[in-house]
């Protein structure tokens, strides 16, 4: 298959070398574990964290005479993912045997798909930035294919000084290998691609995307070239298990290859590993070609065939995906593209926001969710699922501001109380006397006292009306933030003789 270069060289993404500029070319192979209660070809459980070899059937252990039976739910999940990637769904696909020896691969081969995958070409739109002007750039990244395959088991070499152990719990677990085209041109683009892909998978409910549990892993293909020249020799960095590490691995590998080429050397096509501790890649083995695996159709499995009605039935029940949701937030709620992008980045955040925004001003809800809630969660190192402030509680705080019960400053204090102690916002305001002062007489008295105590500031303010804000701040401070800010501002201007 010929590889087509669809990207125009962009100087913003060039890497300066000692002898001129270079361009990095990146392709990704993401292994995403299918969300399913049982494995691809057996009924064994896929539960994470079980005792070693607790979830192993006779099929998974490759016992003689045991035949694989396809899991229909895994097929549906692959089709859903293909639809979410705007990809071509192939109504006929074939499972092949990929032959290689690993101690944790009992069959001596992996059941995968080679020439006839279940999903063909698709695309993902990523957003890269911001640049120095605060602008984001949308970039289309092509998807080459998606195919189903089995995972291998796990070899453990640190349990005994003289022996290695094998855990087959993962053996036979269904994986979707999602292969991008070599359309990525920087580590930032690669990280944005993985983040967007994981978001889509989570929205679809086809993979949980938990890289720390191994349910999403990335193989990164990296090569460098002079801008506009043919693709160079690529190296594959295997099984990188965090988005941050992917970025670091690409940065190091690109620099490594550039240094070799500028010294007159050549790049060996090889498989490499990334060492997070050192931030370096190191050689693992020479890179295999497809013929090294001796692919051939698995004789124990018939071709996988389904009709258009099967696909349409799945398509009809797809959830709203991030790009569509972002477009709706901008169109219907008046949010900025940036705010909408933040809110749809994770399904749980989008769901939380929509619960808060229901029946309320969308922009106000977005500001509170992004600036206050997500800011507090980030500071505490908590995910949105672990927030101590429910959508109902945050919505209650917003309602109290809107009806004039509390000021914006008091609302910040109220949020802190709810975050730390919980409780109903309205009841907290009532019990702690946090209602803002709207009595004009009480506010006027405070304004008069501040003006009388600061004659020098009065003269300065008359010469420079913008200094009236100082008096507003002093009144708010004197009233413990309870005075209605609009009423204070109006009275200060009136007392100082400024026209509205």
From Swiss-Prot:
PROSITE patterns: GATB (PS01234). Its EC number is 6.3.5.-. GO terms for biological process: glutaminyl-tRNAGln biosynthesis via transamidation; translation. The gene is gatB. It is an enzyme of class 6 (ligase). It comes from Sinorhizobium medicae (strain WSM419) (Ensifer medicae). Keywords: ATP-binding, Ligase, Nucleotide-binding, Protein biosynthesis. Allows the formation of correctly charged Asn-tRNA(Asn) or Gln-tRNA(Gln) through the transamidation of misacylated Asp-tRNA(Asn) or Glu-tRNA(Gln) in organisms which lack either or both of asparaginyl-tRNA or glutaminyl-tRNA synthetases. The reaction takes place in the presence of glutamine and ATP through an activated phospho-Asp-tRNA(Asn) or phospho-Glu-tRNA(Gln). The keyword Transit peptide does not apply. This is Aspartyl/glutamyl-tRNA(Asn/Gln) amidotransferase subunit B. Heterotrimer of A, B and C subunits. Gene3D superfamilies: 1.10.10.410, GatB domain, N-terminal subdomain. Belongs to the GatB/GatE family. GatB subfamily. SMART domains: GatB_Yqey. The keyword Signal does not apply. It comes from the Bacteria. Disulfide bonds: none annotated. It catalyses: L-glutamyl-tRNA(Gln) + L-glutamine + ATP + H2O = L-glutaminyl-tRNA(Gln) + L-glutamate + ADP + phosphate + H(+); L-aspartyl-tRNA(Asn) + L-glutamine + ATP + H2O = L-asparaginyl-tRNA(Asn) + L-glutamate + ADP + phosphate + 2 H(+). GO terms for molecular function: asparaginyl-tRNA synthase (glutamine-hydrolyzing) activity; ATP binding; glutaminyl-tRNA synthase (glutamine-hydrolyzing) activity.
């Amino acid at each position: 298959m010929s590889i087509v270069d669809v990207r125009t060289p962009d100087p913003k993404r060039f890497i300066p070398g000692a002898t001129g500029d270079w361009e990095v070319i990146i392709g990704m192979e993401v292994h995403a574990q299918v969300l399913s209660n049982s494995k691809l070809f057996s009924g064994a459980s896929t539960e994470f964290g079980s005792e070693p070899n607790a979830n192993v059937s006779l099929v998974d252990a490759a016992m003689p005479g045991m035949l694989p039976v396809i899991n229909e739910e895994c097929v549906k999940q692959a089709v859903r993912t293909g639809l979410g990637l705007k990809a071509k769904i192939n109504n006929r696909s074939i499972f092949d045997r990929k032959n290689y020896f690993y101690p944790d691969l009992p069959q001596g081969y992996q059941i995968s798909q080679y020439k006839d995958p279940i999903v063909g070409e698709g695309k993902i739109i990523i957003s890269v930035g911001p640049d120095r002007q605060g602008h984001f750039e949308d970039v289309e990244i092509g998807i080459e294919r998606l195919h189903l395959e089995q995972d291998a088991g796990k070899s453990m070499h640190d349990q005994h000084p003289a022996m290695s152990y094998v855990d087959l719990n993962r053996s036979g677990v269904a994986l979707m290998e999602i292969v991008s085209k070599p359309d990525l041109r920087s580590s930032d683009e690669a990280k944005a691609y993985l983040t967007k892909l994981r978001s889509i998978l989570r929205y679809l409910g086809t993979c949980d995307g938990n890289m720390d549990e191994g349910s999403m892993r990335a193989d990164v293909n990296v090569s460098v070239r002079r801008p506009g020249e043919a693709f160079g020799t690529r190296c594959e960095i295997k099984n990188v298990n965090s988005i941050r590490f992917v970025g670091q691995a690409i940065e190091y590998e690109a620099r490594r290859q550039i240094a070799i080429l500028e010294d007159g050397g050549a790049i060996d096509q090889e498989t490499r590993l990334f060492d997070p501790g050192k931030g370096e890649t190191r050689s693992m083995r020479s890179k295999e070609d497809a013929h090294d695996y001796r692919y051939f159709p698995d004789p124990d499995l018939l071709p996988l065939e389904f009709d258009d009605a099967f696909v349409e039935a799945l398509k009809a029940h797809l959830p709203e995906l991030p790009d569509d949701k972002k477009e709706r937030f901008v169109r219907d709620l008046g949010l900025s593209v940036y705010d909408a992008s933040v809110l749809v980045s994770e399904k749980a955040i989008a769901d939380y926001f929509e619960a808060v925004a229901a029946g309320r001003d969308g922009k106000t809800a977005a500001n509170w969710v992004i600036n206050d809630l997500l800011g507090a969660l980030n500071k505490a190192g908590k995910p949105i699922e672990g927030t101590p402030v429910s959508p109902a509680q945050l919505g209650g705080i917003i309602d109290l501001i809107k009806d004039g019960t509390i000021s914006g400053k008091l609302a910040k204090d109220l949020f802190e109380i709810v975050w730390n102690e919980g409780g109903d916002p309205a009841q907290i305001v009532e019990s702690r006397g946090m209602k803002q002062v709207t009595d004009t007489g009480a506010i006027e008295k405070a304004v008069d006292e501040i003006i009388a105590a600061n004659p020098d500031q009065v003269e300065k303010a008359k010469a420079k009306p913008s200094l009236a804000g100082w008096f507003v701040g002093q009144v708010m401070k004197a009233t413990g933030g309870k005075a209605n800010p609009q009423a204070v501002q109006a009275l200060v201007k009136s007392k100082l003789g400024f026209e509205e």
